Amino acid sequence: FTAVQLPSPTRVIAAGTELAQRGELATHLVISTQRVVLGFSIGAVLGLVLGALIGLWGPARIAAAPTIGALRAVPSLAWVPLLLLWIGIGENSKVTLVAIGAFFPVYTTVSAALAHVDPKLVEAARAFGYRGVKLFTTVPLPAVLPSVVSGLRLALAQAGLFLVAAELLGASMGLGYLLTDSQNNGRTDRLLLAIVLLAVLGKLTDALI
């Protein structure tokens, strides 16, 4: 590889310093972080609610689970044209795409975990007079909590992947945009910087869960 194709760490650091001095680096980081946090929050809440509904209620599982399972297989970039037509090229479409990415891991883990809670434990709790919310927090919730945490961590990683897909198309700021702009201008140093920052951002957000 030439120095242009594979710049030294010194050049990558220099590129980051240059962007930081111009105020662009902080802007890219803040915007991408906002999109990940907002999209992840929306997707995770929807995944928890729908996953709990389908995991606990048999008719909902029979009616909706196959369709949701099929939608889960759709690649991230396939959603982009539809979201652009429905929502436009603004911020909402990017956050929505990130939310889609975060939704499926949470939904899948929660619904599967609740569906496999031992019915004997539930019946035993009912025999002791537990009903409604008290029953849910006593038996199913503790049983699925490890799966929920795993689902949230997977969702956060998936949100990062969908963030890049969202920012590669129709964005003027963010780490995904920095990737595309660096490629178009032959700035491999900035491109590698963006990759490193995405890795650091992913690691930091993963440490929160």
Task: Say what each PLM segment does.
Residues L175-I209:
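Hydrophobic alpha-helical transmembrane segments of polytopic membrane proteins
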Residues V49-L85, V98, T108-A115, V122-E123:
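Cytoplasmic-entry segments and transmembrane alpha-helices of multi-pass inner-membrane transporters
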Residues F1-I42:
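Periplasmic/extracellular loop-to-transmembrane helix junction in inner-membrane transport proteins
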Residues A26, V30, Q34-I54, L197, ...:
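Hydrophobic alpha-helical transmembrane segments of multipass integral membrane proteins
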Residues L25-L29, T33, A63-L71, V110, ...:
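Hydrophobic alpha-helical elements at and bordering transmembrane segments
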Residues T96, I100, G132-A166, D189, ...:
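Transmembrane alpha-helices
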Residues V106-L154, L175, L179:
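Short cytoplasmic-facing helical segments at TM-TM junctions of multi-pass membrane proteins
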Residues T27-V36, L85-V106, V144, R190-I195:
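Loop-to-helix entry region at the N-terminal start of transmembrane alpha-helices
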